[in-house]
Each structure stands twice: as structure tokens, then as C-alpha cells.
Amino acid sequence: MQTAHSVAQVREHVRGWHRKGQSVGFVPTMGNLHDGHISLVREARTRCDVVVVSIFVNPTQFGPNEDFDRYPRTLDADAAALVEAGADLLFAPSVEEMYPLGQNQTWVDVDQLGDHLCGASREGHFRGVTTVVSKLLNIVQPDVAIFGEKDFQQLAILRRMCEELLFPVKIVGAATSRETDGLARSSRNGFLSESERTLAPQLYAHLQQVKTEIIGGERNYRALESRTSQSLNSTGFSVDYITIANARTLAPAGPDDTDLIVAVAAKLGSTRLIDNISLAVVRDR
């Protein structure tokens, strides 16, 4: 595996691959890699001739009171894991390389889809995500880009962005990677204390219970959200939202919606966790 720190270096590699007719898979990350990230790299490996992984902790997707400064930077360990996973190129740029004119110049913003769920409480977050991903796609020029379904809203927004801006890339969503107790793998799990880590799987357990109730015929979604939020709060979480949403629009679902996503964001101590579960329901007659 080779490592590049500049846009020019990546583009030189990409031109060489394209001349050979090789397909390029891309996995963008913020580093501190875990088994979930590695599963994305391996998915890209099965789909493409060469695989590029980026590691960049993007400042523009963090709010002023969020965890940008303490987000783990583990580049050496990450590089070793990527060699083992079969990546061909690691792109690890500086902030100055990605934002040469500063961080408040040109933005890419996807309306509506970013207004719900995490977007309602993390103003500017998805604008930062779409801006940096559009830059990365422009640099890497991949045929396929792999994202985890744990960040379902992000995945939906990036698919919309690529469709509307005519990026010649296939966006692939990979199933959420979980620990054996059901907790969705996340770099932020390392912030959890021992007691918080023991409690954390309850987030997914509550999502499963919501899914069971909907399959069983519950259609009063707002009441179900309220009950679930109260249960999580009483368990020790501080719930930001739990929403039963239309999987296409991400707006709160109604009884006539058939493709649903149940999404949750909650804090344990100072650590913010997100998760989701999808389901299809038969419309009531």
C-alpha cells in the first residue's frame, strides 16, 4: 500500500489506473479504524481492481461544542490495518490540503434531507459532510464509493448529492457492522466508560422492539416514539431523537408509508451514539 498526502499525488495514481482500465473503489473515513471500516474496505476490494481509503478528520462537519479536538487520530495503526485489509492507496491530507482557501468559501448543501434527524440538532453538519465528500470524489474519481448504513441519513444525502450533481460514481451502502451484543461499531465507542459500554447495546435493543411493534400492527408512530424515548431516558440515555421516518424522504412517517427507517441518536455521558433499523410494512387496507 502506498500513502499520499497531496491531491496531486492521488491524481497521479488515479490517472495511471484509468490508463490501464482499472476500476477504482473508494472508502472515505475519519480514521481510528475499527472492524466496521475494514468491512467497507473489503467490500470495495470485491467490487474494484484498486481500493483507495481516505483518512481525514473533517473540521467543517463538527459543531463548536462537538468533539473535533478529541476525535482519535491513530494514523500509524490505521495504515497497518489497511495494509492487512488489502487497500492500495491511503490518502491522508492535511486540513490545508483539503481547504486551500480556508473553510468558509464554497459549500455543497443538500436541502430537505438534511433538515431531519441529525440535521435538526447538528446545524451545518451535513453541509460539511457533502462539501468534503464532493471534494474527495473529485480528487479520487472512483467508480464505486462505499459507505456504512449506520449513518443512514448521510448515505441518503450523499446519494442525492451524486444524483443531482451528476457524479459518475456508484454509491454503495454496506450493512451496519455490529459487536456481538448488537452495538453498532463506531470510533466514538472508545469514549464510553465501562458502565456506559455495558448499557450501550440497549440502543439497538430498543430499535428492535420498535420494529417488532410496527410489524405487529402499531401505527401510532408518534406515540411509539414517545414511549421509546422515555424508556431510553429512564435506562440512562439522553435522547436527542428517535424517529420513525419515510426511508426515502426521511420525514416523519405516516400510516400509509411502507418503507421505513427507525433512527435514533442519544448520548451516554458525553458520547453521542446513533443507530437505525429499516423495515417494510404492508399498508393497512
From Swiss-Prot:
Highest taxon above the source species: Bacteria
Annotated beta-alanine binding sites: Q61
Enzyme class: ligase
UniProt: ATP binding residues: 30-37, 148-151, 185-188
PANTHER family per record: CYTIDYLATE KINASE/PANTOATE-BETA-ALANINE LIGASE, PANTOATE--BETA-ALANINE LIGASE
The protein's assembly and partners: Homodimer.
Protein name: Pantothenate synthetase
Organism this protein belongs to: Alcanivorax borkumensis (strain ATCC 700651 / DSM 11573 / NCIMB 13689 / SK2)
Gene name tied to this protein: panC
